């Protein structure tokens, strides 16, 4: 099974990715991991990527796509993979289609975990962190016993500056605008599957499991 996982920040992608790869024993391939592995192995594309990163420059698409090609050609991807964080643009998605053709494979599903932006805002702005021990809480989903006080050490809880409502709303807005053309592209190809991410975590996975179970 060859899958792409999509979803806005706070949609619960990481949790679902863990469950998918654990059950189906396919590699979870994230962009960051791919780059780190290619640079460590000193592959041709990994060395090219390193030369840009060392200069503080953006890695060009052709290098990123080359790294993806190298990674998807590895033995552990024979039975399938879960791509996370790639592609980010329609140009990258088109290049991925070419890679898959060259490998004699196809993408089975693009799983988009859908959550209303208002709920995402609540999920992302509710986080509180202890100043003393770093313990993490959530005002709605995992609140401390006493408001603004850490259960573990009694330290004061605070909200990170980038978790405030305005910053999070802007981040979501940018993500929605960037993601829409990609979702439209995959909708047209017939790969896109929308998953209701507003349910309990286990129910979200159960829905994914029903969908992809037939591919195993």
Curated annotation (Swiss-Prot):
InterPro entries the record matches: Adenyl_kin_sub, Adenylat/UMP-CMP_kin, Adenylat_kinase_CS, Adenylate_kinase_lid-dom, P-loop_NTPase
This enzyme's EC code(s): 2.7.4.3
Keyword set, alphabetical order: ATP-binding, Cytoplasm, Kinase, Metal-binding, Nucleotide biosynthesis, Nucleotide-binding, Transferase, Zinc
CC terms in the record's Gene Ontology section: cytoplasm; cytosol
GO biological process: AMP salvage; nucleoside diphosphate metabolic process; nucleoside monophosphate metabolic process
Domain of life: Bacteria
Region (NMP): 30-59
Subcellular location, record wording: Cytoplasm
Residue stretches in coiled coil: none
Main subcellular location: cytoplasm
Similarity annotation: Belongs to the adenylate kinase family.
HAMAP family documented for this protein: Adenylate_kinase_Adk (MF_00235)
Function, as annotated: Catalyzes the reversible transfer of the terminal phosphate group between ATP and AMP. Plays an important role in cellular energy homeostasis and in adenine nucleotide metabolism.
Protein name: Adenylate kinase
Source species of the chain: Bacillus cereus (strain ATCC 14579 / DSM 31 / CCUG 7414 / JCM 2152 / NBRC 15305 / NCIMB 9373 / NCTC 2599 / NRRL B-3711)
């Amino acid at each position: 099974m060859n899958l792409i996982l999509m979803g806005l920040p706070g949609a619960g992608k990481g949790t679902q990715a863990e469950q998918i790869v654990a059950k189906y024993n396919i590699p979870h391939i994230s962009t960051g991991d791919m780059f780190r592995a290619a640079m460590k192995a000193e592959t041709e594309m990994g060395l090219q990527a390193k030369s840009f990163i060392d200069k503080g420059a953006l890695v060009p698409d052709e290098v990123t796509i080359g790294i993806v090609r190298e990674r998807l050609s590895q033995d552990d991807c024979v039975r399938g993979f879960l791509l996370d964080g790639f592609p980010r643009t329609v140009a990258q998605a088109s290049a991925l289609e070419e890679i898959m053709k060259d490998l004699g494979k196809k993408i089975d599903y693009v799983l988009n975990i859908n959550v209303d932006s208002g709920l995402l805002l609540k999920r992302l702005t509710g986080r509180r962190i202890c100043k003393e021990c770093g313990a993490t809480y959530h005002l709605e989903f995992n609140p401390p016993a006493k408001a603004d006080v850490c259960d573990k050490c009694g330290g004061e809880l605070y909200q990170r500056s980038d978790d405030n409502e305005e910053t999070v709303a802007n981040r979501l807005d940018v993500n929605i605008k960037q993601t829409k053309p990609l979702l439209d592209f995959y909708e047209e190809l017939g790969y896109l599957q929308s998953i209701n991410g507003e349910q309990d975590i286990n129910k979200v996975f159960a829905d994914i499991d029903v969908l992809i179970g037939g591919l195993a």
